[in-house]
Curated annotation (Swiss-Prot):
<protein>
    <recommendedName>
        <fullName>Selenide, water dikinase</fullName>
        <ecNumber>2.7.9.3</ecNumber>
    </recommendedName>
</protein>
<dbReference type="GO" id="GO:0005524">
    <property type="term" value="F:ATP binding"/>
</dbReference>
<feature type="binding site" description="in other chain">
    <location>
        <begin position="54"/>
        <end position="56"/>
    </location>
    <ligand>
        <name>ATP</name>
    </ligand>
</feature>
<dbReference type="GO" id="GO:0005737">
    <property type="term" value="C:cytoplasm"/>
</dbReference>
<feature type="binding site">
    <location>
        <position position="97"/>
    </location>
    <ligand>
        <name>Mg(2+)</name>
    </ligand>
</feature>
<dbReference type="InterPro" id="IPR036676">
    <property type="entry name" value="PurM-like_C_sf"/>
</dbReference>
<feature type="binding site" description="in other chain">
    <location>
        <position position="97"/>
    </location>
    <ligand>
        <name>ATP</name>
    </ligand>
</feature>
<dbReference type="InterPro" id="IPR036921">
    <property type="entry name" value="PurM-like_N_sf"/>
</dbReference>
<feature type="site" description="Important for catalytic activity">
    <location>
        <position position="26"/>
    </location>
</feature>
<feature type="binding site">
    <location>
        <position position="57"/>
    </location>
    <ligand>
        <name>Mg(2+)</name>
    </ligand>
</feature>
<keyword id="KW-0808">Transferase</keyword>
<comment type="function">
    <text>Synthesizes selenophosphate from selenide and ATP.</text>
</comment>
<feature type="binding site" description="in other chain">
    <location>
        <position position="74"/>
    </location>
    <ligand>
        <name>ATP</name>
    </ligand>
</feature>
<keyword id="KW-0479">Metal-binding</keyword>
<comment type="similarity">
    <text>Belongs to the selenophosphate synthase 1 family. Class I subfamily.</text>
</comment>
<dbReference type="InterPro" id="IPR010918">
    <property type="entry name" value="PurM-like_C_dom"/>
</dbReference>
<dbReference type="Pfam" id="PF00586">
    <property type="entry name" value="AIRS"/>
</dbReference>
Amino acid sequence: MTETKQTDAAAPRLTSLSHGGGCGCKIAPGVLSELLRRTAPPALFPDLLVGTETSDDAAVYRLNDEQAIVATTDFFMPIVDDPFDFGRIAATNALSDVYAMGGKPILALALVGMPINVLPHETIAAVLRGGEAVCADAGIPVAGGHSIDSVEPIYGLAALGVVHPARVKRNAAARAGDVLVLGKPLGVGVLSAALKKDRLDAQGYAQMIATTTKLNRPGTALAALPGVHALTDVTGFGLLGHTLELARGAGLTARVRYGALPWLAGVEALVADGVLTGASGRNWAAYGHDVRLGDGLPAVAQALLTDPQTSGGLLVACAPEAVDDVLACFRDDGFERAAAIGEMVDGAARVDVS
């Protein structure tokens, strides 16, 4: 999916207008936890199947015995300079949270903040067209939205989906013995940092766009597999952060095999050369005390494992006998690099990497 480039030579680079980009814009997990602790505990609503308790990907509200609504919102500042690609990435990332609950998207609303007197109107329109193109690919309308004049460019979606109440996939239901399966290769944050430093070649940019604009559609089909116990997506807190959420939610230890992890081409060399995001360090500071990195890992391991993923892959915890079906579900939708990367075992709520 491409759009003919009609760039305005006088227009500033989108990434030059923001202090962060993509899911690297997220408030650091430690700070976010502290902020939420200062708010009132949520009231009890019997039909609210998923709320804020386990930092899950979306809210789920039961309408009746056959239907529940999945509701989520996601927006961020530019991770790339091409406005159409920015819109596509942001929309793909927002819809991922619906898929991560096992849901099927049905509707989106656009969330738009733009420096209206700085960016050409055609640039802003291209962002909107990018988001609409992804929603069309997902089979849903962008049915409205809200816009403001802001200092930094911001775009995203509020998205609604549907799921059967019995098929909701939480991030807190993994079981001892489950195998962890990852849907997409890692390293988007590193590539985005390289882009901002003019260190990313055309091939690197192409692979970044390909992975960040690929809808996590398998989530809907995974919800129908009884052997799938827990589901989330890997975004701003990096692989370690979101795996740790699975471990904490289940009260188990997650074991990750570093050698089994799929990486985007070139990211290890870039990190070795000092190209990484500030969010990587903030992530480690927030949760590194609950992670054990084994001896013999490469020097770049910590930075890569905490690298913030924008529009990252689904992370599945499933019974061992369901692994082949889970991998087939991914590969039937073109996720050729989906891989089993570890397992859940009895033990303290932490992540061990070997």
